[in-house]
Amino acid sequence: MLGADTNILVRLIVRDDDPQCRMIEELMVSERLFVSLSVILETEWVLRSSYRQSRIEIAAALTELTAVESLIFEARGDLLWALDRYAAGADMGDMIHLISNRDMPAFVTLDRKLSAQAGPDTPLPIRTLA
């Protein structure tokens, strides 16, 4: 298994460079690629800021990639939850922070909106200090 960089996911989603897409697809025939949560976070930022994609487009594209057999996503189940919350209006960074801390007893924040954005199925309790 190899670790995948952000540009790998971006190419697979936007498909704006045929030779690079072919190289990635050929590699994925023989290798599995690990996608970390930090790569997901940067991919969201690139798609939003450079490619002007909407949160709905981004969430749908990333969700679709989680079904690709040769892509192994860190905390896949939690990531799907985060993508669902992101599509509903939550901040992607905040959702990644929550799932990255899923083994902690609680997540502490000063952000009063975070609990509402995370919804009732958050992977850990959120404690707001304000």
Spell out what each predicted region is:
Residues 30-33, 70, 102-106:
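Short active-site oxyanion
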Residues 85, 98-130:
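Acidic, PIN/NYN-like endoribonuclease modules and their adjacent C-terminal/linker elements
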Residues 37, 60-87:
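Acidic catalytic patch
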Residues 8, 39, 78, 96-97, ...:
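Alpha-helix capping/helix-boundary segments
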Residues 4, 35, 73, 92-95, ...:
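Short beta-strand scaffold positions
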Residues 1-35, 50-60, 121-130:
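Short, well-structured N-terminal submotif of metal-dependent ribonuclease cores
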